[in-house]
């Protein structure tokens, strides 16, 4: 079965026609139906009137014709359904504004940001190409009062503190999981338009008034408490009046001028005294408050402070004892050098001979130096005296001679160069003489 529909417009006349072809086994029949012409002003349901076939053999196609007629009737009814009229442009875009506001509020709540009107204004305007106003939010509440909870608040916008509205979702709204806010708002908007056909615009619901920026309860209460405290602590300013005895003179103008000048001087002096007393009282209060704050310490804080103080005292005492011990050792070495100055000069000469014998060596064992010193003719010291003399030299001249332990062996190291120049014998003897002279002068 094949259906074909033809439409043509000629002189405001609509022509509708179709033909049905039935394919049978080995034969082809063509059924033609009559077509009625109607004016374009008539409804679409009357555009074509289908008549039943005159041939009785074509009775098989009657159900198909009935179904086609029913479809045409239902389509005409759908097109002729009356929709609620649009009242205003704000009503036309109110659904779009609601969707944009809902998206922005969800975004800001997801990132833990307070969705305020000043924050949503630019974003919603960018999404809808419409400038968002407070009246739009009030109209949304008129259509759906439970859609948002709008409360006044303070916020920082562009570096300034401003009063605005905060948007949030009501806590007591029990909505199912698969609930779409945009669909619900559209349904409520259509319902409102059907119920209020006579109104030309959606009325705006009254919102709470914005708080004033000048009213700050915290600062105001603290300021009141401060003023009451100053009134209670400050003394009353009393300006004493000095009574002057009248002078029995004929010049009354002179007497009046003197009286006025005296009263002005007295008032200025009393005012200056009161101001000074007030300043002293404030300084006394500040010092007493500092003392009270310093006294308010717990037992744990006091114990910690005491232990830290004791630690500092112990460290200072240990440092002083170590310094005294070092000074005593140095004095002992210097005393010994002063008594045995000649023998130490001979020992330095023997060491320089040892260094010249081994020009590439800087370190020697203690036994090696002691044996070389005993083999010399100019030295008549025992091994213990030689070892003690070398130890005293290492303490007196640490920049030239040092003693280190390598296991159980004492190793004596001599520095041949100081500051890029060779260490000379005369330089060492001069240092010894200066130390000995300083010790002798200090003892005398």
Swiss-Prot record:
InterPro entries: Cdt1, Cdt1_C, Cdt1_C_WH_dom_sf, CDT1_Gemini-bd-like, WH_DNA-bd_sf. Disulfide bonds: none annotated. Belongs to the Cdt1 family. Pfam families: CDT1 (PF08839), CDT1_C (PF16679). SMART domains: CDT1 (SM01075). It comes from Schizosaccharomyces pombe (strain 972 / ATCC 24843). GO terms for molecular function: DNA binding; DNA polymerase binding. DNA replication licensing factor, required for pre-replication complex assembly. Faithful duplication of the genetic material requires 'once per cell cycle' DNA replication initiation and elongation. Central to this control is the tightly regulated formation of prereplicative complexes (preRCs) at future origins of DNA replication. Required for the recruitment of the MCM helicase complex to the replication origins. The gene is cdt1. It is found in: Nucleus. Keywords: Cell cycle, Cell division, Mitosis, Nucleus, Ubl conjugation. The keyword Nucleus applies. GO terms for biological process: cell division; DNA replication checkpoint signaling; DNA replication preinitiation complex assembly; mitotic cell cycle; mitotic DNA replication initiation; mitotic pre-replicative complex assembly; regulation of DNA-templated DNA replication initiation. Interacts with cdc18. GO terms for cellular component: chromatin; nuclear pre-replicative complex; nucleus. Coiled coil: none annotated. Ubiquitinated by the DCX(DTL) complex, also named CRL4(CDT2) complex, leading to its degradation. This is Cell division cycle protein cdt1. The lineage of its organism: Eukaryota, Fungi, Dikarya, Ascomycota, Taphrinomycotina.
């Amino acid at each position: 079965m094949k259906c074909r529909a033809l439409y043509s417009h000629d002189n405001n006349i609509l022509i509708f026609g179709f033909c049905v072809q039935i394919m049978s086994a080995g034969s082809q029949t063509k059924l033609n139906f009559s077509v009625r012409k109607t004016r374009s002003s008539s409804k679409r349901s009357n555009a074509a009137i289908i008549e039943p076939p005159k041939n009785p053999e074509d009775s098989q196609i009657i159900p198909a014709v009935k179904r086609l007629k029913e479809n045409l009737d239902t389509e005409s009814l759908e097109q002729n359904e009356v929709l609620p009229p649009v009242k205003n442009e704000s009503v036309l875009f109110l659904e779009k504004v609601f969707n944009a506001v809902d998206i922005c509020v969800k975004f800001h709540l997801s990132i833990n940001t307070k969705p305020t009107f000043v924050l949503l204004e630019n974003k919603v305007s960018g999404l809808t190409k419409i400038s968002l106003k407070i009246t739009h939010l009030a109209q949304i509440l008129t259509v759906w009062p439970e859609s948002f909870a709008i409360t006044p608040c303070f916020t920082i916008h562009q570096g300034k503190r401003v009063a605005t509205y905060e948007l949030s979702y009501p806590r007591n709204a029990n909505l199912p999981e698969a609930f779409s806010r945009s669909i619900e708002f559209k349904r409520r908007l259509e319902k409102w338009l059907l119920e209020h056909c006579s109104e030309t615009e959606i009325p705006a619901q009254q919102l709470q008034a914005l708080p004033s920026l000048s009213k700050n309860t915290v600062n105001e209460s603290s300021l009141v408490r401060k003023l009451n405290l100053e009134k209670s602590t400050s003394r009353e300013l009393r300006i004493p009046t000095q009574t002057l005895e009248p002078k029995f003179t004929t010049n009354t103008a002179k007497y009046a001028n003197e009286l006025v000048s005296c009263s002005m001087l007295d008032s200025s002096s009393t005012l200056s005294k009161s101001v000074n007393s007030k300043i002293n009282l404030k300084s006394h209060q500040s010092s007493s408050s500092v003392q009270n704050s310093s006294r308010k310490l717990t037992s744990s804080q006091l114990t910690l402070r005491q232990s830290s103080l004791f630690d500092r005292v112990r460290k200072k005492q240990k440092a002083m004892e170590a310094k005294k011990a070092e000074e005593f050792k140095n004095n002992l070495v210097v005393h010994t050098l002063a008594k045995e100055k000649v023998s130490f000069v001979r020992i330095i000469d023997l060491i320089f001979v040892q260094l010249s014998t081994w020009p590439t060596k800087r370190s020697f064992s203690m036994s090696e130096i002691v044996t070389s010193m005993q083999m010399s003719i100019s030295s008549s010291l025992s091994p213990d005296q030689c070892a003690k003399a070398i130890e005293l030299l290492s303490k007196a001249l640490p920049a030239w001679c040092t003693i280190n332990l390598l296991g159980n062996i004492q190793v004596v190291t001599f520095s041949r160069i100081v500051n890029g120049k060779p260490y000379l014998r005369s330089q060492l003897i001069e240092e010894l003489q200066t130390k000995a002279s300083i010790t002798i002068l200090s003892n005398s």
